[in-house]
Amino acid sequence: MISPQEKQDKVIRATDLDALSCRYSANNKSYFSKPDPFIDSLISSYKMHLPLCTGYTNMSANRTLRSVFNEQKLPLINRGTYLRTESIDVITQEFIKEFKKCQVISLGGGSDTRCFRILEEHGEDVRYCEIDFHESVKIKKLAIINDKKLADIVKYDEESQSITSKEEFARLESNIHTENYHLIGYDLRELTGALDSGAILEYVDTSLPTLILSECVLCYLNPKENERIIEFWKNAFASKALLALLIYEPMSLNDAFGTTMTHNLSNRGINLLTFNEYPNLEARYKFLSEKCQSSNVKLTDMSNVGGYDSDNTTKAWINSKDLARINRLELVDEIEEIRLLLKHYCLCYCEFSHSPSLKTINKWKWILE
């Protein structure tokens, strides 16, 4: 029997499977201009090792995996996944292009494959750190060490491992540390602003311009934990290199659609603790600029990113050629429906430092800045 906290953590970890299945679907439908060759390795590791995780049996793990990967995703979900992935990718690539030698820290990196794409292209210049729950990290570690291509990309040269029991899985060291890649098992809720989390900072280079990514991660923490985690990173980089934060997550907008989202998530045992606390772009701007004391704050909803609220010719997030391409992939009948859905997801960027800002952050159209 698992504890209530373990049960809640299991629910949160399961959202990583949701995200992976959405990327898998969008990839299979050819939404990404460059197909993602790394997704299958993560899925294989999940299929092999999810039964070994806390709260799962072979039967329940297989049922969960069938549920998420056999489900046909709606076109609006595939399009939303594309816009989410593409918008974060373009900002990350611009950050790397502008600063050359830099660092990316992914909070709740889980099954995300962005690290492999970036290190494959920029491995000599970019230091990449991923932090997530221990069990999520172990599944990713096993994907890496049992796939030569992934191991070569992150420069991991130890032998592959076969883990077949819960006992072996529990004993497995979760972390990977190579020259430019660090995979760290850590509960982000344990971070404090006091810089007492040496397990993290030991592998972070605070002299490098750094972009922190949070994709649907901070939304599972309460507002105080949000402040504490941001304060931790702010203190770590105080008076040093540029620290930038990029957040993607849902917001309620205090409307009927937001209420429906809340009920649907609640039925799955998911409580988005910032969903109603910061219900719109204005509330999030105030949180980042006033409570967190960040600068160069910029926010948009994903409807704007997808070009549903503008002519998409000035400072467009997605160029007209790519928009035309994805419009041909699947028919989306209800434009108003996808616009409404995308209105409830936001992209937030801000900086902490007196160092030079990311100049090219202004190349895209933001709603609030």
Curated annotation (Swiss-Prot):
Cross-referenced InterPro entries: LCMT1 (IPR016651), Ppm1/Ppm2/Tcmp (IPR007213), SAM-dependent_MTases_sf (IPR029063)
Natural source organism: Debaryomyces hansenii (strain ATCC 36239 / CBS 767 / BCRC 21394 / JCM 1990 / NBRC 0083 / IGC 2968)
Coiled coil (residue ranges): none
Molecular-function GO terms, alphabetical: protein C-terminal leucine carboxyl O-methyltransferase activity
Residue sites binding S-adenosyl-L-methionine per the record: R84, G108, D132, D187, L188, E215
Class of this enzyme: transferase
Family: Belongs to the methyltransferase superfamily. LCMT family.
Record keywords, A-Z: Methyltransferase, S-adenosyl-L-methionine, Transferase
Entry function: Methylates the carboxyl group of the C-terminal leucine residue of protein phosphatase 2A catalytic subunits to form alpha-leucine ester residues.
A family per Pfam: LCM
Protein name from the UniProt record: Leucine carboxyl methyltransferase 1
Presence of the UniProt keyword Ubl conjugation in the record: no
GO biological process assignments: methylation
Catalytic activity from the UniProt record: [phosphatase 2A protein]-C-terminal L-leucine + S-adenosyl-L-methionine = [phosphatase 2A protein]-C-terminal L-leucine methyl ester + S-adenosyl-L-homocysteine
Transmembrane segments: none
EC number(s) stated in the UniProt entry for this protein: 2.1.1.233
SUPFAM superfamilies: S-adenosyl-L-methionine-dependent methyltransferases
Domain of life according to the entry: Eukaryota
